Design a protein with these regions (language model features):
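The feature captures the beta-strand-to-loop junction immediately N-terminal to the Walker
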Residues: 73-75
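Helix-to-loop junction immediately C-terminal to a conserved catalytic motif
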Residues: 88
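ABC ATPase NBD coupling module
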Residues: 47-54, 106-126
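Short beta-strand immediately N-terminal to the Walker A/P-loop
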Residues: 70-71, 127
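Conserved beta-strand
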Residues: 20-23, 47-48, 52-65, 96
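Conserved Walker
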Residues: 81-82
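Conserved ABC transporter NBD signature motif
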Residues: 96-108
Length: 132
């Protein structure tokens, strides 16, 4: 799978800033064990009980256009921050892709090497971490 592709335009003509394609994030030492259970629509508790893995995000697809303001709302523990941390590859994506606009080229951060990730983190993605 290529780490770059031509930037797609949003419906209103703007370029896309970030694209999440069927993103799945699982925490634990054997995340692949959870995937078939996720596909069978088992609950987060059932997956953790059977595999010891913790489901963070299941099958999320979302596109954010350049200049768009997007709010992710949900209950505590629903995966909002987990999904956002995938933008700069701080959380591992076990299935799916996260594409980030790097000056006109979409970079798949799930497949990017360390040098590319460093560039994306320094010049394309800004993140303010939540405080408790």
């Amino acid at each position: 799978m290529s780490t770059t592709e031509t930037i797609e335009k949003a419906e209103d003509g703007r370029g896309n800033a970030v694209v999440f394609e069927e993103v799945n994030i699982v925490f634990g030492d054997k995340p692949q064990l959870a995937l078939p259970l996720m596909d069978a629509n088992q609950s987060r508790a059932e997956i953790q009980s059977e595999t010891g893995q913790v489901l963070g995000v299941h099958n999320c697809s979302l596109t954010v256009a350049e200049g768009e303001i997007l709010v992710l709302m949900g209950l505590s523990g629903s995966g909002k921050s987990t999904l956002l941390r995938a933008v700069n590859a701080l959380n591992p994506v076990v299935r799916g892709r996260v594409l980030v606009n790097d000056h006109g080229t979409m970079i798949d951060v799930t497949q990017a090497d360390a040098k590319t990730l460093r560039r994306v983190r320094l010049s394309c993605v800004a993140m303010v971490f939540q405080q408790f």
